[in-house]
Structures are given as structure tokens and as C-alpha cells.
Amino acid sequence: ELMKTRAEIYGNEAATLLRTVTMYPGLSQQQLLCFHPGKSETAKALLSHLERQGRIFQSDNGGYFPAGYSPKADQALIKAVWVLLDFIQQADYHAPAEFPVKLVFFADGELYEVAYVAHGQEALVCHALRGNKGGSRRIIVVDSPTQIAKIDCPDISGFCTVSQDGQTQYFKKAGGT
């Protein structure tokens, strides 16, 4: 009886991990372990298990992908996931989203949208966000803080940059909005 329960728990964790790899293809092991706070050894074992089963594979650059996917990571999504991971303890729900938003999550009763704005895309993304009124809080990922002055759209909670190794740095817009 006890063994079955343990296998079920393990199975649930494996299914959750597989779902995460499928929703956000290309995440590193470090990112995937952050989805399972306090259970990194279990999560590591499950990644190996899913890999041996042929359900997922690790690309040359270290990202994990579902079987059958081409190993091309969406760098903007990977940056947005680092932002999500800052809130993962409070996040009740998260999912990838449509352009210009990369992902959405619920935390503390609020809906957050994480959008990415590449250099030169400020006007385009703002235009897309204006038509996208949802009463959510928006976190805008930028390549550099110099872009912030060019971004003017509603419901922005803050801006951030994300380094290659996943360090997030948050900024408020000048003028306190």
C-alpha cells in the first residue's frame, strides 16, 4: 500500500515535470529544478527517468525538450521563465501566452503578464499590449534599461533585465508609473 502511494507521488511529480518541459521547451536543468523548490534531488532523478523513457531529451546547449521537438529554444521565453521563477512560491498557476506576452501567472490573487521587448520592438509591443486590456499587472523584460523610456503602455508593474545566468534586475519607470 505504501509503495503504491510513493509510486503515485513520483508519477505525479514526473507528469508535472513533463508538462513544464512541454510548456516551456529549452529550459535548463537549473530552471526546471526551481519549479520544484526543496525537491531538487527528486527532480534531477525524474529528469533522468524521463530522459531514459525517451519522453524528453537534453540538447547540446543543455536545454530540455519534449521528444520530437526541434531543439530550438525561444530565448525570450527562457528569460520570461526566470521572472516567473522569482514568484514561483506564490504562483498558483502559470502558462505560456500569445505575443507580445510570453507567459502569464497568478500570484496572490493577481494576474501577471510577462512580456519581452527586444531592441527596436518597443512601439510594436506597446501597440499590441494596448489592444490587450485585461486588468493584469505587466512585467516587461527588456534587453537593456535604456529601452524603458521608450515603452509607454498601460498596466506596467515594472521592468526587468535578465542576464544569461538568470539574474533578474527590476526597475520602475521614471516618473513613478
Residue ranges and their predicted role:
Residues 1-16, 74:
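Short alpha-helical segments that sit at the start of domains
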Residues 13, 25-28, 52:
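N-terminal low-complexity or simple alpha-helical regulatory segments
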Residues 20-23, 52-128:
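Nucleic-acid-binding surface
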Residues 23-36:
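Short acidic, hydrophobic short linear motifs in intrinsically disordered regions
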Residues 31-32, 46-49, 60-61:
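N-terminal, charged amphipathic alpha-helical interaction modules
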Residues 37-52:
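Short amphipathic alpha-helical interaction segments
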Residues 117-169:
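Catalytic cores of nucleic-acid endonucleases
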Residues 173-175:
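Charge-dense, extended regions
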